[in-house]
């Protein structure tokens, strides 16, 4: 620090820089690393945080179509609940991609729960109108398996770092400025993935953890992105 100002240091460069360490961020980091890319994953708190690893429960429930014939109904239900705000292409990608994604997680060795005890098979998902296929990712197992895989693939983990700004050059994002509270660092990248979650904790009454504060949306907006589908879910 000089004259009351922090110096900006070049920390590192990589092919893919991932901001956020929930399920989306972890999945992006693993997929990029498996393709041969060098990956840095940055998270404000600890690894495995946010709503994906909500501390008030044992795991994360995953809802999908009961079978192929149920896909159209689930797509329609999501779009109806979304009151016209849902992107049809993204809805279809979710519905058609959820089972392959679940199988990939299972093949990695992560323990998944199935509905079947105490009337669980009779439960209807929130905002839905019928029974669907349900699987639950057990957090303890996910942390163990994902940590091992991230290490095997050589993903660099920078936890306890706050992202302050996305850096642009020639009309594209080329890196980010982060801080550990004592120093400023620039991380350069060829591609950047924002997986920082939602913004539910900005509201006085919310169910999510305090780190779900809209950081990614603010960074993206400042970098010139257009925000869509901004409605609170937690």
Regions found by a protein language model. Give the residues of each.
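Extreme N-terminal leader/targeting segments of oxidoreductases
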Residues: 1-16, 34
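Conserved N-terminal/central alpha/beta ligand/cofactor-binding core
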Residues: 2-5, 31, 44-172, 178, ...
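Core beta-strand elements of the Rossmann-like FAD/NAD(P) dinucleotide-binding domain
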Residues: 11-14, 182-191
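N-terminal Rossmann-like FAD-binding beta1-loop-alpha1 element of flavoenzymes
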Residues: 16-41
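Ligand-binding pocket scaffold of soluble enzyme catalytic domains
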Residues: 25, 157, 184-185
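A glycine- and small-aliphatic-rich helix-loop capping segment at beta-alpha/alpha-beta transitions
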Residues: 34-37, 59-63, 208-214
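Glycine-rich loop(s) and the adjacent beta-strand/alpha-helix scaffold that form part
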Residues: 191-234
